[in-house]
Regions:
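C-terminal accessory regions
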Residues: 22-189
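Mixed-charge, Lys/Arg-rich low-complexity intrinsically disordered regions
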Residues: 1-22, 26
Length: 189
C-alpha cells in the first residue's frame, strides 16, 4: 500500500533492509516460476551471496528443500552446478506501485530479492507444504486456535520420525470443526 503523502510503501511483504547469512533458512515470498515450482512459500537454505565487481549483490543461490524446485532454472545454468551443486540462482524482483490516481503516470518501483528468513513459519503458511526427509519438523501445537489447525501442522512431515513436539501435548488443541464432522458422518452412511 502506497502512502499518498510521502510515497512510502507498506504491507508489501518486504522489509526496509534484507539481512541474510549463509546457511540461513529462507522462503520465497512471491511466485517466480510456478511451472518450475519456484512458488510463494517454497523453503530452502541460502548457499551463496554472489556479488558483482563493485560489491553489489547480483544474485543469491538457494538449495531448496523440495528437489524439484528450480530444476528447470538449474538446467539453464550448468556452471552454477559446478560451484554450488543443487543450488538455484535467485535474482532481484521488481514490483511497480501507482503513487496517485490511476493513469497519472506516477509510480514507485520496489526492487528486492523475493526471499525472507524462515527459521520458523506459521501453520497457515505451511498448508500444502511437505517437509522432506531427512529434515525434522518441530511443531508447537499448543498455539493451535482454529479447528483442523493442528492437523495442518502435524501433516507436514513425510514420516513420524521427522516429527518433534516440544513440551506437553494437549489434545484439547487438536480438533475438527463440527461442520466437518457432520459431513464426514454423512459420507460414511
Amino acid at each position: 500500500i502506497v502512502n499518498q503523502k510521502d510515497g512510502t510503501v507498506s504491507n508489501s511483504g518486504f522489509m526496509d533492509e534484507l539481512r541474510l547469512k549463509l546457511n540461513a533458512k529462507v522462503m520465497l515470498i512471491r511466485n517466480i516460476d510456478t511451472c518450475d515450482s519456484l512458488t510463494n512459500g517454497q523453503t530452502g537454505t541460502l548457499m551463496a551471496i554472489e556479488k558483482d565487481s563493485s560489491g553489489y549483490v547480483k544474485h543469491l543461490v538457494v538449495l531448496f528443500d523440495r528437489p524439484a524446485a528450480g530444476k528447470q532454472l538449474r538446467a539453464k545454468n550448468p556452471q552454477l552446478a559446478k560451484t554450488h551443486p543443487g543450488g538455484t540462482m535467485i535474482e532481484t524482483y521488481s514490483w511497480q506501485y501507482s503513487l496517485g490516481k490511476t493513469g497519472t503516470g506516477s509510480t514507485a518501483t520496489l526492487i528486492q530479492f523475493p526471499i525472507i528468513l524462515a527459521h520458523a513459519i506459521t501453520a497457515h503458511k505451511t498448508q500444502g507444504m511437505t517437509v522432506y526427509k531427512p529434515k525434522t519438523c518441530s511443531l508447537d501445537v499448543t498455539s493451535a486456535f482454529e479447528a483442523a489447525q493442528a492437523y495442518v501442522m502435524l501433516g507436514r512431515p513425510q514420516s513420524l520420525e521427522q516429527l518433534f513436539i516440544p513440551g506437553q501435548l494437549d489434545t484439547n488443541n487438536i480438533y475438527a470443526s463440527s461442520k466437518a464432522l457432520e459431513e464426514y458422518k454423512k459420507m460414511n452412511k
